[in-house]
Amino acid sequence: MPNRRKLLLAAGLSSCALPCVQAARQPKQPHVVVIGAGGAGLAAAAEAARCGALVTVLEKQNAVGGDTLISGGFYAAVDPKRQIPQGISDSIERFTADLLESGGEKSDPRLAQILARGAGAMLEQLESLGMRFQPDVIEIYGAHWPRCHKPMMPNGVGYIQALHSAALRRGAQIRTNCQ
């Protein structure tokens, strides 16, 4: 396949100088395109950009946030750092059992265990991105144990602010009003 230098020589510099300058100004094609700028989309964009990918997020609404903005925002994770000072004994096994019970025993035990094991690390990652939670864990309706982390900001606002900032800081492009 011919390279740019051979094409320039063949066509003559004067006849293609303007198109080459214009081509150089066009943004590179993204490696990753994320559809939706809610919590999951922004998290995917931030992580892909952290790994060096050129990321473009396409959001149909006029602002980021999606359904995460209207969620309760509580985050469940085994968290000895917060639970032990409150006198709460918890474990990955107990969390896994609670997930299976709340799923009416229809949940995949392997996936429940992956969620229970990974929730603590994800909590730390969220906090490293600027997400802030209240200092005590609580038990919420539908939960079986006090392991829920309540955001400092209402609903999902804190998640969106932290993930949106991380995605932008890492170089992701976010486009709203996409049809």
Regions flagged by a language model, labelled:
Residues G41:
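N-terminal Rossmann-fold NAD(P) dinucleotide-binding loop
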Residues K60-Q179:
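Conserved N-terminal/central alpha/beta ligand/cofactor-binding core
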Residues P27-G38:
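Beta1/beta-strand and adjacent pyrophosphate-binding region of the FAD-binding site
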Residues A48:
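Aromatic pocket-lining residues of Rossmann-like dinucleotide-binding sites
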Residues S15-Q26:
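Bacterial Sec-dependent signal peptides at the C-terminal "C-region" and cleavage site
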Residues L54-E59:
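Short beta-strand "acidic-cap" motif of Rossmann-like dinucleotide-binding folds
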Residues M1-S14:
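N-terminal secretory signal peptides and thylakoid transit peptides that target proteins
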